[in-house]
Amino acid sequence: ITSYCKPEAVVTTPSFLAFSAKKSSFVLFAKAVGEAGLNVAVYTNYAYLIGTPRAIGPYGVGRVKTVMGWHANIAGYPLEKYYLDYIEQYDEDWGFIPQKYAIDIFAAAIRKAGSANPTDVAYALEGFRYDGGVGEVWMRPDDHQLILPLYVATLRNTSEGLKYSADDTEYGWDTDVKIEAEQNILPHTCEMDRP
């Protein structure tokens, strides 16, 4: 006598998927979700990088959501002019705000320290506050973490009323929610050794 166990299959559809990988891995994942016909949000933290919206294409529209410090369709902020000037000068898209913050804050810390000595600059960075163009950005003194506002945005067709595209495509980012810098502060256990 052979006994067969036939468990009942339970098929569920998740309410969302989270994926943290850069470009090619994420693009393959997002396309697979689209091709499978899963109508779920796909959250990631790298979809805004140059080349990704173009590679994802229609598979990401209304589905891919990313966390970022800025995107071009945030109207009314000084970064819009910076964005347009960058495109005019370099003939390519720009969307990676941490680069701008790093350069601006580092230059300001050198000026504040009155020197390029790494120790002097490191101390000048501690507690440094800066208008990042979409809100205050600051360097937490305890662990040198950059605290800044974040946006959760969804990839949409520009025909849905978006002013700017991403990657010179027909797709752009549309804000779902802004998370203020104060809401991004998490406790830490860092104990930096200072010179």
Language-model-derived ranges and their functions:
Residues 1-37, 72-81:
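Extracellular/periplasmic Venus flytrap/periplasmic-binding protein
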Residues 2-6, 27, 31, 84, ...:
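Solvent-exposed, polar/charged alpha-helical surfaces in well-ordered, non-transmembrane soluble domains
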Residues 14, 39, 61, 134, ...:
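Active-site lining segments that contact anionic ligands and/or coordinate catalytic metals
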Residues 19-23, 45-48, 67-71, 143, ...:
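Active-site-proximal beta-strand/loop segments in catalytic clefts of secreted hydrolases
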Residues 30-102, 111-116, 165, 170-194:
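Extracellular/periplasmic periplasmic-binding protein-like sensory domains
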Residues 106-109, 154-156:
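A bilobed periplasmic-binding-protein/Venus flytrap-type ligand-binding module shared by bacterial periplasmic
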Residues 117-134:
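Short, well-structured alpha-helical segments that form the helix of a local strand-helix-strand
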Residues 129, 133-195:
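Solvent-exposed, acidic/polar segments of extracytosolic/periplasmic ligand-binding ectodomains
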